[in-house]
Amino acid sequence: MTNLKLDVQTADGNINGSVELPAEIFDREVSVALLHQVVNAQLAAARQGTHSTKTRGEVRGGGRKPFRQKGTGRARQGSIRAPHFTGGGISHGPKPRDYSQRTPKKMIKAALYGALSDRARNARIHVVSELVPGQTPSTKSAKAFIERLTERKSVLLVVSREDINAQKSANNLPGVHILAADQLNTYDVLKSDDVVFSVEALHTFINRASGAAQEEQN
Protein backbone atom coordinates (compact mmCIF):
# COMPACT_ATOMS: atom_id res chain seq x y z
CA MET A 1 0.00 0.00 0.00
CA THR A 2 1.27 3.45 -0.90
CA ASN A 3 0.05 6.92 -0.09
CA LEU A 4 -1.44 8.82 -3.01
CA LYS A 5 -0.69 12.48 -3.70
CA LEU A 6 -3.30 14.74 -5.25
CA ASP A 7 -3.05 18.35 -6.39
CA VAL A 8 -5.34 20.84 -4.69
CA GLN A 9 -7.33 22.64 -7.38
CA THR A 10 -8.48 26.22 -6.94
CA ALA A 11 -11.65 27.78 -8.30
CA ASP A 12 -9.67 29.97 -10.71
CA GLY A 13 -7.98 26.96 -12.34
CA ASN A 14 -4.66 27.00 -10.50
CA ILE A 15 -2.99 24.45 -8.23
CA ASN A 16 -2.54 25.32 -4.57
CA GLY A 17 -0.17 22.66 -3.23
CA SER A 18 -0.97 19.00 -2.76
CA VAL A 19 -2.44 16.62 -0.19
CA GLU A 20 -1.56 13.05 0.69
CA LEU A 21 -4.23 10.36 0.82
CA PRO A 22 -3.21 7.79 3.46
CA ALA A 23 -2.91 4.26 2.10
CA GLU A 24 -4.77 2.73 5.05
CA ILE A 25 -7.90 4.54 3.83
CA PHE A 26 -7.46 5.10 0.09
CA ASP A 27 -5.45 2.03 -0.94
CA ARG A 28 -7.34 -0.87 0.58
CA GLU A 29 -8.38 -4.15 -0.99
CA VAL A 30 -11.89 -4.03 -2.42
CA SER A 31 -14.33 -6.80 -1.54
CA VAL A 32 -17.33 -6.72 -3.85
CA ALA A 33 -19.25 -9.06 -1.54
CA LEU A 34 -18.65 -6.73 1.41
CA LEU A 35 -19.71 -3.67 -0.58
CA HIS A 36 -22.87 -5.49 -1.66
CA GLN A 37 -23.74 -6.51 1.90
CA VAL A 38 -23.19 -3.06 3.39
CA VAL A 39 -25.07 -1.23 0.63
CA ASN A 40 -28.00 -3.65 0.93
CA ALA A 41 -28.10 -3.07 4.69
CA GLN A 42 -27.97 0.70 4.19
CA LEU A 43 -30.83 0.66 1.69
CA ALA A 44 -32.85 -1.68 3.91
CA ALA A 45 -32.41 0.65 6.89
CA ALA A 46 -33.78 3.52 4.79
CA ARG A 47 -37.09 1.71 4.26
CA GLN A 48 -39.97 3.04 6.37
CA GLY A 49 -41.64 -0.33 6.81
CA THR A 50 -45.02 1.30 7.54
CA HIS A 51 -46.93 -0.77 4.97
CA SER A 52 -50.00 -2.46 6.44
CA THR A 53 -52.94 -4.43 5.04
CA LYS A 54 -56.05 -5.61 6.88
CA THR A 55 -56.72 -9.26 7.54
CA ARG A 56 -60.24 -10.70 7.49
CA GLY A 57 -60.46 -10.01 11.21
CA GLU A 58 -59.62 -6.31 10.77
CA VAL A 59 -61.91 -5.44 7.84
CA ARG A 60 -65.16 -3.77 8.90
CA GLY A 61 -68.25 -5.97 8.61
CA GLY A 62 -68.57 -9.62 7.75
CA GLY A 63 -69.57 -10.77 11.20
CA ARG A 64 -72.78 -12.42 10.00
CA LYS A 65 -72.86 -15.59 7.96
CA PRO A 66 -73.96 -14.47 4.44
CA PHE A 67 -76.40 -17.36 3.96
CA ARG A 68 -77.34 -20.60 5.66
CA GLN A 69 -74.96 -23.52 5.62
CA LYS A 70 -77.12 -26.02 3.70
CA GLY A 71 -79.87 -26.06 1.14
CA THR A 72 -78.85 -23.19 -1.14
CA GLY A 73 -76.78 -25.19 -3.60
CA ARG A 74 -73.92 -22.80 -3.12
CA ALA A 75 -70.57 -23.39 -1.50
CA ARG A 76 -70.65 -22.76 2.22
CA GLN A 77 -69.40 -19.35 3.34
CA GLY A 78 -68.77 -17.98 6.79
CA SER A 79 -68.02 -14.30 6.10
CA ILE A 80 -68.12 -11.84 3.21
CA ARG A 81 -64.77 -10.55 4.42
CA ALA A 82 -62.90 -13.78 3.69
CA PRO A 83 -59.82 -13.27 1.46
CA HIS A 84 -61.46 -14.71 -1.67
CA PHE A 85 -64.29 -12.12 -1.56
CA THR A 86 -64.04 -8.70 -3.19
CA GLY A 87 -63.57 -6.27 -0.32
CA GLY A 88 -62.38 -9.05 1.93
CA GLY A 89 -59.25 -9.14 4.04
CA ILE A 90 -55.79 -9.79 2.65
CA SER A 91 -54.14 -13.09 3.45
CA HIS A 92 -50.41 -12.98 4.20
CA GLY A 93 -50.24 -9.28 3.32
CA PRO A 94 -47.49 -6.90 4.47
CA LYS A 95 -47.52 -5.65 8.03
CA PRO A 96 -45.39 -2.94 9.68
CA ARG A 97 -41.86 -4.20 10.25
CA ASP A 98 -38.31 -3.02 10.79
CA TYR A 99 -36.11 -3.79 7.77
CA SER A 100 -32.83 -2.66 9.34
CA GLN A 101 -30.01 -5.17 9.51
CA ARG A 102 -27.27 -5.37 12.09
CA THR A 103 -23.98 -4.52 10.40
CA PRO A 104 -20.76 -4.41 12.48
CA LYS A 105 -18.99 -1.04 12.49
CA LYS A 106 -15.77 -2.62 11.21
CA MET A 107 -17.60 -3.92 8.14
CA ILE A 108 -19.16 -0.50 7.47
CA LYS A 109 -15.75 1.16 7.75
CA ALA A 110 -14.02 -1.45 5.57
CA ALA A 111 -16.69 -1.08 2.88
CA LEU A 112 -16.35 2.72 2.86
CA TYR A 113 -12.56 2.54 2.62
CA GLY A 114 -12.87 -0.03 -0.16
CA ALA A 115 -15.22 2.21 -2.14
CA LEU A 116 -12.91 5.22 -1.70
CA SER A 117 -9.90 3.10 -2.70
CA ASP A 118 -11.66 2.09 -5.91
CA ARG A 119 -12.36 5.73 -6.76
CA ALA A 120 -8.79 6.76 -5.88
CA ARG A 121 -7.20 4.07 -8.08
CA ASN A 122 -9.29 5.21 -11.03
CA ALA A 123 -8.40 8.91 -10.56
CA ARG A 124 -11.94 9.77 -9.57
CA ILE A 125 -11.13 11.65 -6.37
CA HIS A 126 -10.48 15.39 -6.57
CA VAL A 127 -9.45 17.89 -3.90
CA VAL A 128 -10.32 21.59 -4.07
CA SER A 129 -9.37 24.52 -1.88
CA GLU A 130 -12.81 26.08 -2.30
CA LEU A 131 -15.76 25.50 -4.59
CA VAL A 132 -16.38 29.16 -5.44
CA PRO A 133 -14.13 32.18 -4.85
CA GLY A 134 -15.18 34.82 -2.36
CA GLN A 135 -18.01 34.76 0.15
CA THR A 136 -20.95 35.00 -2.26
CA PRO A 137 -22.65 31.77 -3.41
CA SER A 138 -22.60 31.24 -7.17
CA THR A 139 -24.23 28.22 -8.78
CA LYS A 140 -22.83 29.24 -12.16
CA SER A 141 -19.25 29.30 -10.85
CA ALA A 142 -19.70 26.01 -9.00
CA LYS A 143 -21.08 24.34 -12.13
CA ALA A 144 -18.19 25.58 -14.27
CA PHE A 145 -15.60 24.45 -11.71
CA ILE A 146 -17.08 20.94 -11.34
CA GLU A 147 -17.31 20.55 -15.12
CA ARG A 148 -13.65 21.53 -15.32
CA LEU A 149 -12.75 18.85 -12.77
CA THR A 150 -14.67 16.01 -14.42
CA GLU A 151 -16.84 15.29 -17.44
CA ARG A 152 -18.84 12.62 -15.64
CA LYS A 153 -22.44 13.33 -14.73
CA SER A 154 -22.70 12.14 -11.13
CA VAL A 155 -20.54 13.91 -8.53
CA LEU A 156 -20.39 13.55 -4.75
CA LEU A 157 -19.30 16.81 -3.13
CA VAL A 158 -17.88 16.49 0.39
CA VAL A 159 -17.56 19.81 2.24
CA SER A 160 -17.41 20.93 5.85
CA ARG A 161 -20.63 21.71 7.69
CA GLU A 162 -19.50 25.32 8.10
CA ASP A 163 -19.01 25.82 4.35
CA ILE A 164 -22.45 27.28 3.71
CA ASN A 165 -21.13 29.08 0.63
CA ALA A 166 -20.32 25.81 -1.15
CA GLN A 167 -23.55 24.16 -0.02
CA LYS A 168 -25.70 26.97 -1.39
CA SER A 169 -23.71 27.14 -4.62
CA ALA A 170 -24.05 23.45 -5.47
CA ASN A 171 -27.41 22.71 -3.90
CA ASN A 172 -29.42 23.05 -7.13
CA LEU A 173 -26.91 21.46 -9.50
CA PRO A 174 -28.28 18.32 -11.19
CA GLY A 175 -26.16 15.24 -10.59
CA VAL A 176 -24.35 16.78 -7.61
CA HIS A 177 -24.94 15.32 -4.15
CA ILE A 178 -23.58 17.19 -1.11
CA LEU A 179 -22.45 15.57 2.14
CA ALA A 180 -20.50 16.62 5.21
CA ALA A 181 -17.34 14.67 6.05
CA ASP A 182 -19.05 12.79 8.89
CA GLN A 183 -21.90 11.74 6.57
CA LEU A 184 -19.70 9.97 4.03
CA ASN A 185 -21.00 6.47 3.32
CA THR A 186 -20.44 3.53 0.98
CA TYR A 187 -23.68 3.88 -0.98
CA ASP A 188 -23.19 7.53 -1.95
CA VAL A 189 -19.54 6.93 -2.92
CA LEU A 190 -20.47 4.02 -5.19
CA LYS A 191 -23.49 5.81 -6.62
CA SER A 192 -21.36 8.76 -7.73
CA ASP A 193 -18.88 8.69 -10.59
CA ASP A 194 -16.45 11.14 -8.94
CA VAL A 195 -15.85 12.33 -5.38
CA VAL A 196 -14.81 15.95 -4.81
CA PHE A 197 -13.40 16.82 -1.37
CA SER A 198 -12.75 20.27 -0.04
CA VAL A 199 -9.37 20.36 1.73
CA GLU A 200 -11.03 21.05 5.07
CA ALA A 201 -13.51 18.19 4.67
CA LEU A 202 -10.75 15.79 3.62
CA HIS A 203 -8.64 16.61 6.68
CA THR A 204 -11.72 16.23 8.91
CA PHE A 205 -12.50 12.83 7.42
CA ILE A 206 -8.91 11.57 7.71
CA ASN A 207 -8.61 12.81 11.31
CA ARG A 208 -11.87 11.08 12.26
CA ALA A 209 -10.72 7.86 10.61
CA SER A 210 -7.32 8.02 12.33
CA GLY A 211 -8.94 8.70 15.70
CA ALA A 212 -11.28 5.74 15.29
CA ALA A 213 -8.34 3.50 14.38
CA GLN A 214 -6.42 4.55 17.51
CA GLU A 215 -9.44 3.84 19.72
CA GLU A 216 -9.71 0.33 18.26
CA GLN A 217 -6.03 -0.33 19.00
CA ASN A 218 -6.43 0.83 22.60
Curated annotation (Swiss-Prot):
In terms of superkingdom, the source organism counts as Bacteria
Compositional bias of kind Basic residues: 62-73
By its UniProt entry, which Gene3D superfamilies does this protein fall under? 3.40.1370.10
> Per its record, how is this protein called by name?
Large ribosomal subunit protein uL4
Against PANTHER family, the record matches this protein to: 50S RIBOSOMAL PROTEIN L4, LARGE RIBOSOMAL SUBUNIT PROTEIN UL4M
Location of region: Disordered: 46-102
- Which terms in the GO cellular component ontology are assigned? ribonucleoprotein complex; ribosome
User: Which NCBIfam families did the record assign?
Assistant: rplD_bact (TIGR03953)
Subunit structure as annotated in this protein's UniProt entry: Part of the 50S ribosomal subunit.
Biological role stated in the UniProt entry:
One of the primary rRNA binding proteins, this protein initially binds near the 5'-end of the 23S rRNA. It is important during the early stages of 50S assembly. It makes multiple contacts with different domains of the 23S rRNA in the assembled 50S subunit and ribosome.
Q: Spell out the InterPro entries in the cross-references.
A: Ribosomal_uL4 (IPR002136), Ribosomal_uL4-like (IPR013005), Ribosomal_uL4_dom_sf (IPR023574)
Q: Which UniProt keywords apply?
A: Ribonucleoprotein, Ribosomal protein, RNA-binding, rRNA-binding
Any one Gene Ontology BP term: translation
The question of whether Transferase is a record keyword is answered with no
Q: Organism source for this protein?
A: Corynebacterium glutamicum (strain ATCC 13032 / DSM 20300 / JCM 1318 / BCRC 11384 / CCUG 27702 / LMG 3730 / NBRC 12168 / NCIMB 10025 / NRRL B-2784 / 534)
Alphabetized GO MF terms: rRNA binding; structural constituent of ribosome
Q: Which Pfam families match?
A: Ribosomal_L4 (PF00573)
The entry's family comment says: Belongs to the universal ribosomal protein uL4 family.
What gene is this protein a product of? rplD
